[in-house]
Curated annotation (Swiss-Prot):
Gene Ontology BP term (one): translation
Family from the record: Belongs to the universal ribosomal protein uS9 family.
GO CC terms of this entry: cytosolic small ribosomal subunit
PANTHER family cross-referenced by the UniProt entry: RIBOSOMAL PROTEIN S9, SMALL RIBOSOMAL SUBUNIT PROTEIN US9M
Entry keyword Cell cycle: no
Keywords, in A-Z order: Ribonucleoprotein, Ribosomal protein
Name used for this protein in its record: Small ribosomal subunit protein uS9
Molecular function terms, GO-annotated: RNA binding; structural constituent of ribosome
Gene (UniProt): rpsI
HAMAP family linked to this entry: Ribosomal_uS9_B
Gene3D superfamilies xrefs: 3.30.230.10
Originating species: Rhodopseudomonas palustris (strain HaA2)
SUPFAM superfamilies reported in the protein's UniProt record: Ribosomal protein S5 domain 2-like
Length: 158
């Protein structure tokens, strides 16, 4: 860039060389399933999705049995509803660690990532909805000299 800019028009006329947006390809195994792992708190979910009638199996059990609370089942369905693919994919997942809320969040994260592996064009919709972002909030550790992470022991003035 040896010549100097004289106006803003010249600056906007310059073509900036930006790298092209990365292209995502369909990643499917020999059985026609897309695989992804999802994490939330201490829970880790391994998720496989394939085209089907919309059945969801969690740890070899129906989703209604494993996640009895409707809020948790709704959390799991959110990525499919946001992508307008509810009832079009069968979901099989194994989840371990954490409690039920963390496990539901891990399954939701895994379903979102598996959907992008199966249909890369859904990535924008799921990213905008915040389903592909790993929720990094974990339990704060307990500190010595304290009763819990932040709670102090009872203080007596006299």
């Amino acid at each position: 860039m040896s010549e100097t800019m004289q106006s803003l028009d010249q600056l906007s006329a310059l073509k900036t060389t930006q790298p092209d947006a990365p292209t995502y390809t369909k990643k499917v195994d020999k059985f026609g399933r897309a695989y992804a792992t999802g994490k939330r708190k201490d829970a880790v979910a391994r998720v496989w999705i394939k085209p089907g009638a919309g059945k969801v199996i969690v740890n070899s059990r129906e989703v209604e049995v494993y996640f009895a609370r409707p809020v948790l089942r709704m959390m799991i369905q959110q990525p499919l509803v946001a992508a307008a693919r509810a009832g079009q994919y069968d979901v099989i997942c194994t989840v371990a660690g954490g409690g039920l809320s963390g496990q539901a969040g891990a399954v939701r994260h895994g379903i979102s990532k598996a959907l992008t592996n199966f249909e890369p064009e859904l990535r924008g919709v799921l990213k905008k909805g915040g389903f592909l972002t790993r929720d990094s909030r974990v339990v704060e550790r307990k500190k010595y000299g304290k009763a819990k992470a932040r709670r102090s022991f009872q203080f007596s003035k006299r």
